[in-house]
Amino acid sequence: MVKNETSCIRFSDRKICPSCGSNHVIKNGFTGNKKQQFICKSCKKRFIDYYTYKAYNHWVNKSIIQFTKEGLGIRSTARILKISTTTLLKRIISIAKNIDQPIISKGKTNEVDEMCTYVRHKRNFIWLVYALEKESKSIVSFNVGKRTNKTLRRVVETLILSEAKTICTDRLKNYKFLIDERLHSVKRFGTNHIERKNLTLRTALKRLNRKTICFSKSMVVLVSILKIYFWC
């Protein structure tokens, strides 16, 4: 006979705040489910003695970031953390909204390239355009959309505003209309680093792989996953 028990995650057996570790905790009424609620007088955050649903655990967001950067899919992450896929998708979007784009250093050489993926089905091509700083190998800007000047312009303009020393690209004609000749470089081996980064991305994130059954169902989720992978 299988015994059905509710798995409980104890937060405050010793009445210690799970957010800041302070012991200045007092009772603060009850929740709708009649569970005792506490409030920390130090950080002013509320919590209850235990949570029956693991999505409320304070380390879940850190695990979501870690698993996303390791390339796990939505269902794999939800299965390991024992939370629903709907909750996971909402958390991923929420985490991404709180991530700020890094400040771009002035006078640097940057490489720009585009990578093809798709959303919902393989006929709906979507392009990831991003810029990589040549010295630090870090992603400084990216955009997702159709392969048009509008999509490319958002990335290129951030580099121009940062007073980039050189912007290296491939021979895609669109760049000629967006980048000044004095900044633009299309020399051989000029995009070696970003081409290698493309391979890393396709290996790490299955949704970017060419031959795969994994795909993005939503543009919002795709952008959120990329923000977490690049800047978190």
Segment roles from a protein language model:
Residues 1-232:
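Residue-level recognition of single "structural anchor" positions
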